[in-house]
């Protein structure tokens, strides 16, 4: 039960079922469920995320991180956090209920007009401007992580991989986010800063215009290789020049030349095309009508089992836990201990160090091979992809490359011994 220590002071002596009444389930992920609920004292509608910490042991740091970041935020553009309660191994996280669904939901009935897109992007930018002023990076900006209230207010959600800036940049080897929206410098594991969120915003802008991010027809692993290598995506089709220029500004491969969130709020696409957020209720109503007609019954996420229908027949929003690449515990930047906890944080999971063969064998060999290919006029693209595959494998399983090399050497030795034995018997 060591992994529960970090949550020891999450109101563990209070029974959350006495304080809150669970209503309809509005989302389900691998390790938790989200319910619409009522605060029994204030009668306010809330969202209740219930996570079984026994089943979610590998996600403990992400959960602590989300609680820590949300508890430090005070902005109308960030999902509000009200507190958390530990009952046995179940963690109840009480958050603001946003009944308008996600920006991804609003895309499902069909394309959005630019006025809607600009208005949503303006509110995301306000949230990013606040976060960046607090020296925080979201690191997973996408339509699924943008929630709306029933009145059309737009708020950023899902802070499980948010980072805290130290000095001006996050250190290398902090590889997090969702592949299609990930900035080139994050994939290359260079040092990066809040400009990584601006790249993700540019991809989200294309997602809002097209219904999906660029390269969505490709395998995510393939996309990780292509983003650093290819030219930045562009917004194609019959869209206004200011919209295309906005996307182009966000998707500069050199983060130094990407504008800040504050600067983008002054971009002509934002200043000319936006309306009040109450205008977005038209999209929410459109989505509810579309859903009431029987559309969208199946979950679009392989990792989510979404219960879109409320038990009383009311159309509720869909809350998802979308698949995201998380940082391994040894590379966590801002390890969030439980809020108000005076005890030691949860014991970190011991991780095997990264493979030594990466620096002593893999990189030198690939360096030699690429040099030979260049001299012969060949392309080094495939070699670069294979080399990157080693780095990606190490992120999910540190030490795997050393194990592979040991196994290969053993196989070569056995093969060599077998050949020598056959030669000597002839």
Swiss-Prot record:
Binding positions (ATP): 26-34, 49
Entry-linked PROSITE patterns: PROTEIN_KINASE_ATP, PROTEIN_KINASE_DOM
Record entry for activity regulation: Interaction with Golgi matrix protein GOLGA2 leads to autophosphorylation on Thr-174, possibly as a consequence of stabilization of dimer formation. The C-terminal non-catalytic region inhibits the kinase activity.
TM ranges: none
GO-annotated molecular function: ATP binding; metal ion binding; protein homodimerization activity; protein serine kinase activity; protein serine/threonine kinase activity
Function noted in UniProt: Oxidant stress-activated serine/threonine kinase that may play a role in the response to environmental stress. Targets to the Golgi apparatus where it appears to regulate protein transport events, cell adhesion, and polarity complexes important for cell migration. Part of the striatin-interacting phosphatase and kinase (STRIPAK) complexes. STRIPAK complexes have critical roles in protein (de)phosphorylation and are regulators of multiple signaling pathways including Hippo, MAPK, nuclear receptor and cytoskeleton remodeling.
Protein name, entry field: Serine/threonine-protein kinase 25
Enzyme Commission designation: 2.7.11.1
CDD domains linked to this entry: STKc_STK25 (cd06642)
